[in-house]
């Protein structure tokens, strides 16, 4: 008699969808169904609702006990995809599908980036050549602890990459998000000095264009 396949559950979420600096990080964590109660008992939340210290503690515990995979898209790859008219939703569909393809779970819980959560799941399923159940939902990181786990690992990994960027640049680049004045100040200062944006910036972003426009305007005023 054939041995029954063990049910495996996968949660997937991303960090760094909106920033103008740094990569997009997608994490998939996979556990056996019997491990779900332990994940739930950890009291995980959406990574954005946790302190940095708590995120790092949870991430260390999760990585030590469960299998996970990361997909990291640097700014250059994001920009190249946009030049070929791929949008961010399509990029994430490909990343999510790649992680699912590698792990081949029985069920995958996804934090949908598309405004239509059902469509996001359908588009991912079209990329796969095997059957599985997909649960695609908005704010899945607040609804499903397995997705909260993926969210935490993705966020902690991206934060570490942003710290590396600051170290490489020799100054604080901030969080990388457009609303962060430290990030915008860094980009403007860099552009004024080098007449270009750094490699860590997503040059296809509207924020990048706005930074360049502001710098060019400032130069015009200097010569008036």
From Swiss-Prot:
UniProt-recorded Gene Ontology molecular function terms: manganese ion binding; RNA binding; RNA-DNA hybrid ribonuclease activity
Coiled coil segments of this chain: none
Protein name stated in the entry: Ribonuclease HII
Similarity-based family: Belongs to the RNase HII family.
Keywords from the named record: Cytoplasm, Endonuclease, Hydrolase, Manganese, Metal-binding, Nuclease
Function: Endonuclease that specifically degrades the RNA of RNA-DNA hybrids.
Subcellular localization(s) per the UniProt record: Cytoplasm
Enzyme Commission no: 3.1.26.4
Species in which this protein is naturally found: Methanocella arvoryzae (strain DSM 22066 / NBRC 105507 / MRE50)
GO biological process: DNA replication, removal of RNA primer; mismatch repair
List of residues binding a divalent metal cation: 13-14, 111
Cofactor, how bound (note): Manganese or magnesium. Binds 1 divalent metal ion per monomer in the absence of substrate. May bind a second metal ion after substrate binding.
Cofactor names: Mn(2+); Mg(2+)
Catalytic activity entry: Endonucleolytic cleavage to 5'-phosphomonoester
Domain of life, source organism: Archaea
GO annotations of cellular component type: cytoplasm; ribonuclease H2 complex
The RNase H type-2 domain, residue ranges: 7-217
One Pfam family it belongs to: RNase_HII
């Amino acid at each position: 008699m054939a041995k029954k396949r063990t049910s495996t559950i996968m949660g997937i979420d991303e960090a760094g969808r909106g920033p103008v600096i740094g990569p997009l990080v997608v994490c998939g964590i996979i556990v056996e169904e019997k491990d779900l109660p332990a994940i739930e008992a950890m009291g995980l939340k959406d990574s954005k609702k946790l302190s940095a210290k708590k995120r790092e503690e949870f991430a260390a515990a999760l990585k030590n006990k469960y299998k996970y995979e990361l997909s990291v898209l640097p700014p250059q790859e994001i920009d190249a995809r946009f030049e070929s008219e791929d949008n961010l939703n399509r990029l994430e569909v490909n990343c999510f599908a790649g992680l699912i393809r590698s792990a081949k779970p029985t069920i995958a819980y996804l934090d949908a980036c598309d405004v239509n959560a059902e469509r996001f799941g359908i588009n991912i399923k079209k990329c796969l050549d095997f059957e599985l159940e997909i649960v695609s939902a908005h704010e899945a990181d607040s609804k499903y602890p397995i997705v909260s786990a993926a969210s935490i690992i993705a966020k902690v990994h991206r934060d570490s990459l942003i710290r590396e960027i600051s170290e490489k640049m020799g100054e604080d680049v901030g969080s990388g998000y457009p609303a962060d004045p430290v990030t915008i100040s860094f980009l403007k200062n860099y552009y004024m000095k080098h007449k270009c944006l750094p490699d860590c910036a997503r040059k296809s972003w509207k924020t990048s264009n706005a930074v360049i426009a502001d710098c060019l305007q400032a130069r015009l005023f200097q010569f008036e």
